[in-house]
From Swiss-Prot:
NCBIfam families: lipA, PRK05481.1, PRK12928.1. Pathway: Protein modification; protein lipoylation via endogenous pathway; protein N(6)-(lipoyl)lysine from octanoyl-[acyl-carrier-protein]. GO terms for cellular component: cytoplasm. It is found in: Cytoplasm. SUPFAM superfamilies: Radical SAM enzymes. InterPro entries: Aldolase_TIM (IPR013785), Elp3/MiaA/NifB-like_rSAM (IPR006638), LIAS_N (IPR031691), Lipoyl_synth (IPR003698), rSAM (IPR007197). Signal peptide: none annotated. This is Lipoyl synthase. It holds the Pfam family LIAS_N. It comes from Bacillus cytotoxicus (strain DSM 22905 / CIP 110041 / 391-98 / NVH 391-98). The gene is lipA. Disulfide bonds: none annotated.
């Protein structure tokens, strides 16, 4: 079997059953009516049917649908972004009410065209959701916002329940995989977030199957723990289109189980690992587990 056929032919464990019941259809209509975007759709997440139809959860993507970066793994559109929509925070908050969410994830495209990287709108979205949904836990998943400390502080001052920022891949592959992002800058971003708000759990995610070695993965885990990251998610990279980076290898469920055990042994309070795991997959369970472990640690 050639490397090309290896990454084009998905193994059985990556095949999913689509479920488009009334919850899924209703949520899709609501998102369009409120002119909102979800990373579930834009990034072609394989779990969209489970989350929307079964769990009735979604990850909102704010600051528009066009990213200023062109990472070679990502399906989100790139180009010249639209103007900021200052009413977007309230629409997101209203949607959380309508959906009855207990946990919401708010992510965004990278906005390198903005001085604050979109931090002010991000923070206002957190506050709007909190005002209208006081019992909903809030997870934020920002870009590195240019690595500017003040931008991160604006977001952390809004006090989300969890700060998620993905390193995406291992150090050796980072420059090839992540356009305009830096491995060490992401680690610093995570470290600073914990320093600013020590009681807020931090989280990061790694895709596998891009050509990394076992040693690369162990090093990345150690790097995250050295910067006090609490939660790790590990999932299989899937090629969105022929224009994106190819899959070099598919990891088996058994390999993911082993990586999870290794991550937990290194001190992560929670690790979600599996072929279809994505950063926001079962996010409600992750934040609950992290908080329980934080209480036990105290």
């Amino acid at each position: 079997m050639t490397k090309q056929t290896e990454y084009k032919r998905k193994p059985e464990w990556l095949k999913i059953k689509l479920n488009t019941n009334e919850n899924y259809t209703g949520l899709k209509k609501m998102m369009r009516s409120k002119q909102l975007h979800t990373v579930c759709e834009e990034a072609k997440c394989p779990n969209i049917h489970e989350c929307w139809a079964v769990r009735k959860t979604a990850t909102f993507m704010i600051l528009g649908a066009i990213c200023t970066r062109a990472c070679r793994f990502c399906a989100v559109k790139t180009g010249l972004p639209t103007e900021l929509d200052l009413q977007e925070p309230e629409r997101v908050a209203d949607s959380v009410v309508q959906m009855g969410l207990k946990h919401v994830v708010i992510t965004a495209v990278a906005r390198d065209d903005l001085k604050d990287g979109g931090a002010a709108v991000f923070a206002e979205t957190v506050r709007a959701v909190r005002r209208k949904n006081p019992f909903t836990s809030i997870e934020v998943l920002p870009s590195d916002m240019g690595g500017v400390e003040e931008n991160l502080r604006i977001l952390m001052d809004a006090k989300p329940d969890i700060l998620n920022h993905n390193i995406e891949t291992v150090r050796r592959l980072s420059d090839r995989v992540r356009a305009r992002a830096k491995y060490d800058r992401s680690l610093e971003f995570l470290r600073r977030a914990k320093e600013m708000q020590p009681d807020i759990p931090t989280k990061s995610s790694i895709m596998v199957g891009l050509g990394e070695t076992r040693e690369d993965l162990l090093e990345a885990m150690d790097d995250l723990r050295a910067n006090n990251v609490d939660i790790l998610t590990l999932g299989q990279y899937l090629q969105p289109s022929k224009k994106h980076l190819p899959v070099i290898r598919y990891y088996t469920p058994a390999e993911f189980a082993e990586l999870k055990e290794i991550a937990l042994s290194k001190g992560f309070s929670h690790c979600e690992a599996g072929p279809l795991v994505r950063s926001s997959y079962h996010a409600d369970e992750q934040v609950r587990s992290a908080k329980e472990n934080t209480v036990e640690a105290k």
